[in-house]
Amino acid sequence: MSSPAIEAVPDILSRLKPIQIGPVTVDEAVLLAPMSGISDLPFRKLVKGYGAGLVMSEMIASQAMIYQNKRTMQMATTSEDEYPMAVQLAGTEPELMAEAARLNADRGATIIDINMGCPARKVVNGYAGSALMKDLKKAGAILDAVVKAVDLPVTLKMRTGWDDDNRNAPELAHIAEESGIQMLTVHGRTRCQMYRGKADWRFIRTVKDATSLPLIANGDIVVEEDALECLNQSGADGVMIGRGTYGRPWFPNQVKHFLRTGEHLPGPGLQEMYDTVSGHYEAMLEHYGPVIGNRVSRKHVGWYTKGLPDSAVFRNGVNNTNNPKEVHRLFHEYFQGLLEQEAA
């Protein structure tokens, strides 16, 4: 049975009109977050195919990009199937960030996104990511350099600030707009929170009030109602979903449907899930090669099947073979068994 419509939905729909990022139009602003080790080309294409308005690459280190590190170049690979898409860059030197942006523009990126939100210690220790929120002069220099370096629209992702005493996202938003940034995304936590506590969607409204740029809210959107509440509290123009897509590449589309109608769109049935899992697995093998692709796939298989009957035994089998044909056999055997149980 479908859920009753939510009274607030018409107000939200008036804000979920297409957003303009320079010359790029995003029809419905439900976005896939840049997630290290997750937002690779196979996953982005899958999420885009399910209806996400815009997808972003995992974070790419600007210096490694310039040195054409093999792994980094693979991370920066794009496909027309995922357009429009953004390549996210991290770094601390304006000149290197500008050069990396030019390289990605030449390789097919639609948008360049600048990371000033990553809380990871190794990134912060290199004075990149959210560390730049402690040095707005340096942050502004990076924004200026990247905007001037490419003809593509440039966007910025940040946190609310470094810590509770320094929530300076509104100030950085103003600097970004002056630099020519075309869209902002704000994760509703400080760097010092990491992923603890709850994202402060209400504070994001202060960032929205500080700028005329399209603003996307991010953090803790794991069910459809979260997106609605986030938009109500933040006043944002859209939402960006990260961990909520683990094992659910269709979730952004469910969010879009809920915001349009106030009703829940059911997830895929077992046959569609089998097709999705096996197709995603094959795409990872093609992208990474059989050895790395098989290894990378295991976390996704775990997320896809979490909560399904006898999934622990199935996952154990998948995790203990490196033979793609055997993995496909296990997929077929497991989902065929579930389909037969469902039909009984």
Feature map (PLM): residue ranges:
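Glycine-rich, flexible loop/turn motifs
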Residues: 15-22, 26, 55-56, 61-62, ...
